[in-house]
Amino acid sequence: MKTELKGWLADNTVTTDNKEDKILVLESAGNLTLSDVLDEMKKEDTGLRAETLKHAVDLFQRTVSELVLNGYSVNTGLFRAVPQFRGVIDGGVWNPERNSIYVSFNQDKDLREAIARTNVKILGAKGDPVYFIGGEDAATRATDG
């Protein structure tokens, strides 16, 4: 599958002294769920039934989750998942109200290679946001501002 990301040029708010300095803001293609991903997988001629694909993906996710939460750094080729602790440990005791577990995900070799092959399309300048400071009800002429 050919990959392409689209984006809008916007002012870089970090460098306010340089009006020509721009960043690219992603034009989202939408949000997908696991079910959507499985539907895309079914389009491939794998010879596998939909239930088999779902079972394999569920097994993969459960296994990676269990391995990470048992202290392993898991490298899948697509990503690397590493567990970390957050918060200060008072008196050498773990306190779930003040401490938490966080798992960081970093892109790995397969994803980096796919990124290198991805086309980027600039859609133009991002328009200024619209601000409404008041309104009037057409029927009652009531205003909110």
Model-derived features: positions:
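Strongly charged
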Residues: 1-55, 59-145
